Curated annotation (Swiss-Prot):
PANTHER family in the cross-refs: TAPASIN
Job description of the protein: Constant region of immunoglobulin heavy chains. Immunoglobulins, also known as antibodies, are membrane-bound or secreted glycoproteins produced by B lymphocytes. In the recognition phase of humoral immunity, the membrane-bound immunoglobulins serve as receptors which, upon binding of a specific antigen, trigger the clonal expansion and differentiation of B lymphocytes into immunoglobulins-secreting plasma cells. Secreted immunoglobulins mediate the effector phase of humoral immunity, which results in the elimination of bound antigens.
Gene (UniProt): IGHE
Domain Ig-like: 6-103, 112-210, 214-318, 324-423
Organism from which the protein derives: Homo sapiens (Human)
Protein name in UniProt: Immunoglobulin heavy constant epsilon
Membrane-crossing residue ranges in chain numbering: 500-520
Amino acid sequence: ASTQSPSVFPLTRCCKNIPSNATSVTLGCLATGYFPEPVMVTWDTGSLNGTTMTLPATTLTLSGHYATISLLTVSGAWAKQMFTCRVAHTPSSTDWVDNKTFSVCSRDFTPPTVKILQSSCDGGGHFPPTIQLLCLVSGYTPGTINITWLEDGQVMDVDLSTASTTQEGELASTQSELTLSQKHWLSDRTYTCQVTYQGHTFEDSTKKCADSNPRGVSAYLSRPSPFDLFIRKSPTITCLVVDLAPSKGTVNLTWSRASGKPVNHSTRKEEKQRNGTLTVTSTLPVGTRDWIEGETYQCRVTHPHLPRALMRSTTKTSGPRAAPEVYAFATPEWPGSRDKRTLACLIQNFMPEDISVQWLHNEVQLPDARHSTTQPRKTKGSGFFVFSRLEVTRAEWEQKDEFICRAVHEAASPSQTVQRAVSVNPGLAGGSAQSQRAPDRVLCHSGQQQGLPRAAGGSVPHPRCHCGAGRADWPGPPELDVCVEEAEGEAPWTWTGLCIFAALFLLSVSYSAAITLLMVQRFLSATRQGRPQTSLDYTNVLQPHA
């Protein structure tokens, strides 16, 4: 992580919670969000004696930065005494110091409203030789208040004109005036009125408003990608100017550095768009170390038809850092995508948002055109996330090839990369298991059967299979037929079917034979017992009386 100075906050108790007869009290000072260690905390107790204790630094989970607390215990006439906590962070700067002055306890109070007003231009719209900035501090509970002016974050050593405090009812107000030369005001610096009150800081800032860009013309600066910065080691920044009207004049793009050091040679490209406008691109190689250390680069655009130059600047993103979490997986097969498979990669909880995503096939980087990645989006917390999607062919996944999703980010350690591998198995959905041997004969079975081997070629229907459009590996509705293949050799359930068929055949033959024998036996029995009567009857029938 890059060097980060601490934020300092006073820690006090509510006055109503401190006994009136207390002989000693404890107050604290919190320094948080700094990197690296250490910080040095000292106290100014005035005329009182006190003992201090600084707790060991703790690591903040999300950013990896540090926080520590220093405690001061004082005795004596502490109620009327102001105390100053002084925090120094040498890694940020040898002279970096933040002072917080506050009392032992906090009373209920109304905080002040801080607002900066500036003098207006003359009748011609021009700034006067001197500019007055007026800081109005109003609406606060009467009490000690301190006003300081800052220029680009640094305390200004100037004589200030501060009015006396006026009180209206239960609230008070005051004001402070700062006079600047026109040169300082036009230098694009930021001026801040900082008010310290009851151990808290309130402020308002102002600067000369940027001139509006010429209508229709826009300029943009892009930072180097993490891939170019940390992998290729050849970072570049790009200045893009769009919506220029073609003319005989020349568009000039000039690069510079805030440090005043020379810049590298840039490349330039002009392209005429379909709407008749001109787009100009200038690409500048930058030093990896210069960029990481926070150098600021500026692109200045001039053209005879522009009323004023356009200025754009870029530098390394500030703020906390967090390494990305990478998850790669294969999506389940879908009925309409038989010849391809989709791999997905979720990358989340990283800061800042600058990230590069690549896919590798058997450790060889794939072209960017083969995959698509979303723009970084904010999470519910303070981090960002992206999704990346890659389509692979059947031939690639049937060879058990390995695919790697790699994220390049400055907070990833030790090499600024985090990667996860995923392999697709034609035998198992999502698959990381080894694929099985492909069978070679085709049978048709109901989709209600489970655990059947896959159809020839994975999910492509076999020419001899006419039992439906489903696939053996797809867990579809039971009423759907699926095409599956029989493994080499005879399947166990084939012999079972033959045995059942033979048993049923023999049973039916036995049943028919038994019925036939029974009928023959009954017929013979009836013949032996009733022969005379039967003959008489037949005689009577054949020879009727005349």
